[in-house]
Amino acid sequence: MSNIALIFGISGQDGAYLAQLLLSKGYEVHGTSRDAEMAEFSSLKRLGIKNKISFHSVALNDFRSTLKVLEEVVPKEVYNLAGQSSVGLSFEQPIETLESIANATINILEAIRFISCNCKFYNASSSECFGDTGENPANEDT
């Protein structure tokens, strides 16, 4: 059985580089977008890997949409890189930010539980959650 990865938020820089790494390790890679048919996936094109990935349209704020893609893909690994990534915009649009990050993560976790997916889950966050750590890098003691 091959390693299958599902990347929520594949169209961003981190998603593209993660997809490239997983492909180099022999993974079958699936990625999501709100509208996979219309999305440009410019980062994936630039890396020359867009045609090696299977794309799925998913509305992460909709549980059924999230559940459907997990049932179709049956991944061994799930990566959540989706959501609002601009700190400034997160303060301007707090409700949308909450929905795009917290509710989406809950939907992914609940869908994994619902289908009894025996998979690894990785949830990306922002270094902004640590605040100002001074001149030192953030670590477990910060």
Which functions belong to the PLM regions below?
Residues 1-142:
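N-terminal Rossmann-like NAD(P)+-binding domain of SDR-like oxidoreductases, especially those catalyzing
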